């Protein structure tokens, strides 16, 4: 007989549907199909936002505190504890389902869901836009069990051997649920794809640093019913939760999780794979000889579609024995039951799981439980979707294995090895295939066994919450994890020496002069700025004019121990220049006295200071407000020491911010320079516009911006300044490294948050009616929403009217169809058109990404501009 289950109450419901009673929307089901169908385990939806998330863009998302965060507080990338995941059984409750987010979770309100739209366009006869309501009402709904696996599952093992570009996942980056929704093929058929169509490109609503997340799969896969590719709006009978794509997502069984796009907004039918940034630079297995540097220097590695990952490979892991589990041999039963999971990709079935206790010389077969097969005998609907597994032979889910092992054999073994094979006879390899993103890691899973005086200790390869895995211990002990013997030394083999960290030598060869505190202070003036880094004394006089940050950057360090900010801010290139300025070593007693003096910078005066910033000491401001400008850009408002205090920052200059490094184990700090956007005469507070560079698999993320993003309101941020060699005085008068000159016009070239220093100059010009300086701004961005301070720029241009005092030109590389402005990068044509003929009375101000600055400089010099008329903030 057929059965319908539409909504199950998950209080004390048994995990299988047999002949027991279950209440379903006031309807009693007393007799069910004889099939034994796994139902979702009891689920408790989180209702409170965790304190960690309250100051992030995900402040609207309640979460389960048991999930293990892998990339700091934000973005949210988590896996459940492995044992807790396995104990839930075949299906995973949504609150424990692993999460891979590249950025903020779109905030979708209940009232927005009926009107959520999905656009199907591209190589189709009839482009259409479907509402969420139409997707539910006009298409057949299917319910199917599907396991999703992150391509980075078990990546920490690769990172232990050699750091990849991806963050570390343990062996729990997978979960299984009953997904409900229409088949993707039915949706696509409504738009009638053209004959030359080959791919389905998908795009989500998440707004990320490199545009919306998008990827593609082959169209013939989407149209193949046996592959089961679908759109889902339910998960285990519940509406999708925010972290899992609420209200609509793609689900691609048998392929890596990165192809199952969340918060789905577009299906674009094309004749080529997606050109989305995340499709190209994520989810690839590059050849093992390609290093991170090689992949950064040669983008062609990423654009080779042969290296893109689609189907999952065969993989397995042991859950029991657990990591750090112990077994008392005297009290143990005769047999120990080892357990774990295995999965394969492309709809292929796991056909065997094998266990070895003698380094792979011999193997024994484990039992395999295929819980997915129980749905093949069920006819009916679950949660509003028809279960159509009866005809389908493809396998979409993980399987569980187990094996009873004599404890005496465990006691005589040094490791338990696990490997699996699928029906294509693909077998897990013994050794790791390292790659630059660390994805698809699937060597034999090894649980180390140590007999400690009659007690067995079991250890997994890595520990996702620490460094207690056997791989981490072997590496620390000098073992070679690539030696084919799991890093363990053969008899007579010498330990591998750890590669030493190469420090740049900042001392001049042959300099032996010892300097005491009296001599150091005597020679530490604005004209002759001596300063200390790592106990060594440097004379910055010769670099006062040439320093990119201006003379003030060096003058501010005069007479101080500048080690912290110098080492935090400066590159290896800058450090290599230091021997030219090295003059001696500060004696030990003087260094201790100097550092004590550096620490004691508190103004003992009880009178309020009129000016906040001081060039030689850090002063404390309080973070009082965060205002979101876009999903990844915020205005941070800092309150000064009192409401009538001036910041003390000249127009065009910068201040340094210092905040604790949340990832440092030694109370380290992060220091960066910023230009505020608040008016220079604003009292009591300062506004700073900052773009948050979140971590991605191929980009480590902004160290300072991610730290600032996690700070709660009320946090103290230290400030110092001013710095910079450029200052705009008024009415065409500028200071360059302290020397005054006059200009009649500015050409301002900027991109992203690089707009902030040139904006300060532009505002100073526009707010002074007597200032006749002409300004042309070329502002380059990716999308319309990336244009910062646009309202203010529009006001300045309107204020100028026909006087040609202000002209703003925006150019976008990824502008939408409705964008009517210029498209493309800031190139030679644009600069030639708007910069005019080079002359002594025009100055070019540039600030933006390093690549843009380098490209613009090359263009400007080729057009005849002299370096003295170019300023790079």
UniProtKB/Swiss-Prot annotation:
FAD binds at residues 672-675, 689-693, 703-705, 756. GO terms for biological process: anaerobic respiration; nitrate assimilation; nitric oxide biosynthetic process. It catalyses: nitrite + NADP(+) + H2O = nitrate + NADPH + H(+). The keyword Acyltransferase does not apply. CDD domains: cyt_b5_reduct_like (cd06183). It is an enzyme of class 1 (oxidoreductase). Residues 616-729 form the FAD-binding FR-type domain. Residues 30-61 are annotated as: Disordered. Mo-molybdopterin binds at residue 150. Residues 512-587 form the Cytochrome b5 heme-binding domain. Its cofactor is FAD; heme; Mo-molybdopterin. Homodimer. PANTHER family: SULFITE OXIDASE, MITOCHONDRIAL, SULFITE REDUCTASE. Nitrate reductase is a key enzyme involved in the first step of nitrate assimilation in plants, fungi and bacteria. This is Nitrate reductase [NADPH]. It comes from Emericella nidulans (strain FGSC A4 / ATCC 38163 / CBS 112.46 / NRRL 194 / M139). The lineage of its organism: Eukaryota, Fungi, Dikarya, Ascomycota, Pezizomycotina. The gene is niaD.
